[in-house]
């Protein structure tokens, strides 16, 4: 009962409190031995404190001057007894309010009944005000930030989109969407559509070009013969189809894919960097994904291109030592005896010999391992190089007709290899200082 009285009384009081005057709320608990009414309680408060505290703290004068608010009483009578609360709003300072509260406890009669008054508490009204201010300020601040962030993000997005649109160019006879660095880059990234190019431009990747569908344009075919090509495709069936088309009509060095079920145009910066960092050499990609028919067809097509040249090269390599055996004058006189190189030997200190060997290996799609004396100790297909080196780490130098990838460098370093010579340099993010890496297409 007392709790219900307290709640309802508090509600009434807060409705009547003048927020400009009230600093404290005195809550007095009332007990009487008999039945009394509200006017009896109010009369006792004024009557029994009159003259008790002097003229400066007289309740009637304080109420007239607005220092004390309207006294609210809530009581309930049961079984011949009355209990309840009286609440007195005070605009006095702390000391004066405390004196006034203590004076209320001197009341010993209310109406005709004996009574007891106890101060339950004196509440600082300003604390609640401050708490309400804090809560409201937080809400206002959050609303301001939300609107400010939205505006800021919208402005940044608008400016960025305009910059990206101004950077994208139309390249080749087919007017393909491309990044502004497509003309100057040794390596290019082939994507599916314009939105893919825009998304990569957003994160500063500018050597991109879009094929605009599965019908690969002549411009892309031509570029693939001149540049190191990474195809960066969606993680869906459409990406698979574009890759197959590229393999049939163009040259591909690396494959990067968006996560399954996602498109390049919707990738975040972190996803793009991860996909490009872990791009896979084309032969390894086809092998890992069970695309054996495509791998066979791609290999055969590239071998056919080099068949005649390869035969001439083999002939040149075979005939050259024979010519070196004896240098003969027109008269048939032998002027110099030259030793014949051992089979499988390569002069690793002679750049000309190394470059010719790399050219021959590129046509054979082969990787070779040499010891420190230049003697060949292993030979295997480029696609098997990483696995073979892991299984049997040996030798001093790798000579490969394929691309020098980050994975090959890591494996070679762990195997104790000191030199890697290859045809092209892939996307390298780190290179140990004590391993020598040379790509002939960039060093000659």
From Swiss-Prot:
The keyword Transferase applies. RNA polymerase that catalyzes the synthesis of short RNA molecules used as primers for DNA polymerase during DNA replication. Also part of the exosome, which is a complex involved in RNA degradation. Acts as a poly(A)-binding protein that enhances the interaction between heteromeric, adenine-rich transcripts and the exosome. Its EC number is 2.7.7.101. Pfam families: Toprim_4. The keyword Membrane does not apply. Mg(2+) 1 binds at residues 192, 234. Its cofactor is Mg(2+). SMART domains: TOPRIM (SM00493). InterPro entries: DnaG_primase, Primase_DnaG_arc, TOPRIM_DnaG/twinkle, TOPRIM_dom. Coiled coil: none annotated. Binds two Mg(2+) per subunit. Forms a ternary complex with MCM helicase and DNA. Component of the archaeal exosome complex. Mg(2+) 2 binds at residues 234, 236. Belongs to the archaeal DnaG primase family. Residues 186-260 form the Toprim domain. It catalyses: ssDNA + n NTP = ssDNA/pppN(pN)n-1 hybrid + (n-1) diphosphate. This is DNA primase DnaG.
């Amino acid at each position: 009962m007392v709790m219900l009285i307290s709640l309802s009384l508090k509600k009434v009081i807060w409705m009547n409190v003048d927020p400009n005057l009230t600093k404290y709320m005195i809550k007095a608990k009332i007990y009487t031995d008999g039945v009394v009414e509200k006017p009896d309680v109010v009369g006792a408060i004024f009557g029994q404190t009159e003259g008790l505290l002097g003229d400066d703290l007289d309740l009637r004068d304080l109420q007239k001057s607005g220092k004390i608010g309207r006294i609210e009483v809530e009581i309930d009578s049961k079984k011949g007894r009355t209990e309840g609360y009286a609440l007195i709003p005070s605009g006095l300072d702390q000391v004066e309010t405390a004196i006034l509260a203590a004076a209320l406890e001197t009341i010993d009669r209310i109406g005709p009944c004996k009574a007891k008054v106890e101060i339950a508490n004196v509440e600082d009204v300003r604390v609640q005000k401050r708490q309400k201010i804090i809560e409201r300020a937080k809400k206002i601040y959050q609303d301001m930030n939300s609107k400010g962030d939205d505006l800021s993000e919208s402005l940044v997005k608008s400016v960025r989109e305009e910059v990206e649109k101004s950077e994208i160019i139309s390249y080749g006879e087919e007017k393909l969407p491309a990044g502004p660095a497509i003309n100057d880059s040794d390596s290019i990234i082939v994507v599916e559509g314009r939105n893919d190019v825009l998304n990569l431009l957003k994160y500063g990747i500018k050597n991109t070009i879009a094929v605009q569908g599965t019908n690969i344009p002549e411009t892309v075919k031509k570029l693939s013969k001149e540049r190191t090509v990474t195809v960066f495709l969606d993680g869906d069936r459409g990406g698979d189809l574009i890759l197959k088309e590229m393999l049939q009509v163009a040259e591909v060095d690396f494959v990067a894919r968006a996560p399954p079920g996602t498109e390049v145009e919707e990738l975040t910066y972190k996803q793009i960097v991860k996909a490009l960092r872990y791009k896979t050499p084309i032969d390894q990609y086809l092998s890992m994904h069970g695309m054996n028919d495509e791998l066979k067809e791609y290999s055969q097509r590239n071998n056919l291109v080099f068949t005649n040249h390869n035969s001439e090269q083999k002939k040149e390599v075979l005939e050259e030592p024979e010519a070196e055996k004896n240098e003969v004058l027109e008269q048939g006189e032998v002027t110099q005896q030259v030793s014949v190189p051992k089979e499988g030997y390569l002069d690793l200190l002679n750049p000309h010999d190394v470059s010719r060997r790399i050219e021959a290996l590129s046509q054979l799609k082969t990787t070779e391992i040499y010891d420190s004396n230049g003697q060949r100790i292993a030979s295997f297909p480029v696609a098997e190089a990483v696995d073979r080196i892991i299984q049997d780490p040996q030798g001093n130098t790798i000579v490969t007709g394929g691309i020098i990838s980050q994975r090959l460098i890591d494996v070679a370093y762990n195997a104790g290899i000191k030199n890697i010579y290859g045809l092209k340099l892939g996307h390298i993010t780190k290179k140990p200082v004590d391993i020598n890496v040379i790509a002939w297409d960039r060093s000659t």
